[in-house]
Regions:
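Active-site metal-binding loops of divalent metal-dependent hydrolases
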Residues: 1, 26-28, 62-64, 94-95, ...
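His/Asp/Glu-rich metal-coordinating catalytic cores
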Residues: 1-69, 73-88
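Short secondary-structure boundary/capping segments
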Residues: 38-40, 73-78, 104-113, 189-193
Length: 242
């Protein structure tokens, strides 16, 4: 859970009564997240820098959750930067496309900003600069572009295919917005900065593209979890997922 509101969802609510036991995540322990504003500025700056130098920007994501927030951020950023209007943004996930229908259907569950925009005839999920990529075969990567593809840890699928294709070129860039598990390619790229990686075909590829890690984790940090527990005043606390 997260106590911090984002572009479309409300923060987690606090129970109105004090439970005897609260089972709560401890994913980040005593770590603190950057503010939403700082994260968004770092994210958009990294993406902008990559496409401005003529590169292709890969954003590996999970199909549901933070993907939708990142699309909203990019669409809003593109809207205020006319020089980027010719640079396409794609999300390449059939699951994400199905999720969009659910998000559009349940606008009433979103935050005040989204509901207000919808009430005035502006559905935030009708993007101006973001489009779905029906098939990888339809991707023209001869020019700068942004692709948001799953899976988020680069272990297989389109995100790994694009990474292997783009990683030798120093103009290109990888922006990692999510959590990565030890042993995955994503974790290795963030924590060990390898000079080469082994492709699915067994070939060793040079890693020349820029790598940026900007956490948009949906898990609460120490401050959020502590605030939640202080408000609940439980007799007992059980920590999980950490």
């Amino acid at each position: 859970f997260s106590r911090q509101p984002d572009r479309h969802l409300l923060g987690a609510e606090t129970p109105t009564e004090s439970p005897h036991v609260v089972i709560v995540e401890s994913t980040y322990g005593v770590q603190l997240h950057d503010s939403r504003e700082v994260r968004e500025e770092r994210f958009t700056s990294a993406v902008h820098a990559i496409v401005r130098r003529g590169g292709r920007c890969l954003i590996p994501v999970f199909a549901l959750g933070r993907s939708q927030e990142l699309l909203l951020i990019l669409d809003a950023y593109w809207r205020t930067h006319p020089e980027l209007h010719g640079v396409p943004i794609y999300y390449a996930s059939s699951v994400a496309k199905k999720c969009m229908r659910i998000y559009s259907t349940y606008i009433n569950m979103m935050n005040d900003k989204v509901r207000d925009a919808h009430a005035h005839g502006n559905n935030p999920w009708n993007f101006s600069f973001v489009q779905n990529l029906p098939s990888p075969d339809m991707l023209d990567d001869s020019q700068p572009l942004v692709v948001m593809a799953s899976p988020g840890m680069l272990q297989s699928g389109l995100s790994k295919e694009l990474f292997e294709k783009w990683c030798p070129n120093k103009l290109n860039g990888l922006v990692m917005p999510g959590y990565s598990v030890y042993g995955t390619l994503a974790w290795s790229l963030i924590h060990t900065e390898p000079k080469t990686v082994k492709s699915g075909s067994g070939e060793y590829l040079p890693v020349n593209l820029s790598i940026h890690y900007i956490s948009f984790s949906a898990h609460s940090d120490y401050a959020q979890t502590s605030e939640f527990l202080d408000a609940c005043e439980p007799r007992h606390v059980v920590h999980v997922h950490g």
